[in-house]
């Protein structure tokens, strides 16, 4: 049983003892802390907070507690029900709310849930703001509303359609070209909110579709993380040759993976690369992704005359850096597309619409499009440590050892070699160092990772 507290909110498994899991008492405590934070930092606000949730089995229970607590704190709750993470983010700005709470554990298994906290811009809290919420929760410095100041719950199911409309109105989403292409797609929406909103998006785009795991029951048919090892069902379906494209989302629809017409993975790292290539071909500019993302985005950005910048891992770090450098597109290599023309948040609907627009313009197969991008492979490893290990000291030694290479230490240590890179990050929740490495072949990437791992082992 697990309860993890971080600057972006809290997540944990359902059931168990207070303080050990995500249970009703802790949900009340952290919702109250967030509401206290919003109250302290909002003047002349709407007094309204948006609440949306994915379809996981505990969602309705958590939603009831969150909404009731916010009402008890004197806030009106704009409850949008079953909704994607990007839909909830957009609902905050569309309704001019003071903030929002997304009830989702993203790609985690069904026994998990979480509260993800948004500011009035519909973006995740900064590190400082998140730490303030955690501090308020720790001190339990709460004051609830008197009976005459209690809030109310307003149910509003209009935001799916408003989200879709905003996507269709993006300048680079070519609805006519997509309709003329008469695409046929297969979609795995993993028994969550993708099965609610994506059919409506595809209908508006004139795309013929078949859905797998469409029922939003929250009883996930397979591990919900959109990785190749979890996607045998849709990959086998694609091998029938009946579809132009396979589309996979995670339970809250902020991550997006594609499958080629022949059943091969397009590659989660290449979701952002392909969409960025299309965007940059029409609106040249800068890009941002996190340090653990593929070098292919840098190559594509350079091809279009822009500058690529790496950010620390985490959506809020990526969006902050995007604003600093004026990036026209960015995201994370796990299939997260952030397109500021829409909003500063990962959005699979935006990614789907832009990818289909690109495919329609190029008039090629998905596998042919994939072949136009630089070929890189990422290996992922981990170094298990003892709880007493000084991880920061180890990372500092690694940095010193490779001082003659290009080193970035904004988030762990990343070493850039001319034709490959390796990134070491310490986990916030386990005594481990995560090791990501990339090269032109999987063998070379794995060998680089193992080489650095041996360097670390020799230091202990």
Report the location of each language-model feature:
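An N-terminal, well-structured beta->alpha segment
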Residues: 1-68, 72-73, 152-185
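Gly/Ser/Thr-enriched, mixed-charge loops and adjacent short helices
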Residues: 13, 113-239
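N-terminal small/polar loop signature for handling phosphorylated ligands or for N-terminal nucleophile
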Residues: 36, 48-112, 200-259
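Short glycine-centered, acidic/aromatic-flanked micro-motifs in structured strand/loop junctions
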Residues: 52-54, 187-189, 260, 341, ...
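Proline/glycine-rich low-complexity loops and linkers
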Residues: 71, 131-165, 169, 260-333, ...
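Short beta-strand-to-turn element immediately C-terminal to the catalytic PLP-Schiff-base lysine
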Residues: 117-120, 257-261, 338-340
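Phosphate-binding and adjacent anionic-ligand microenvironments
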Residues: 245, 283-460
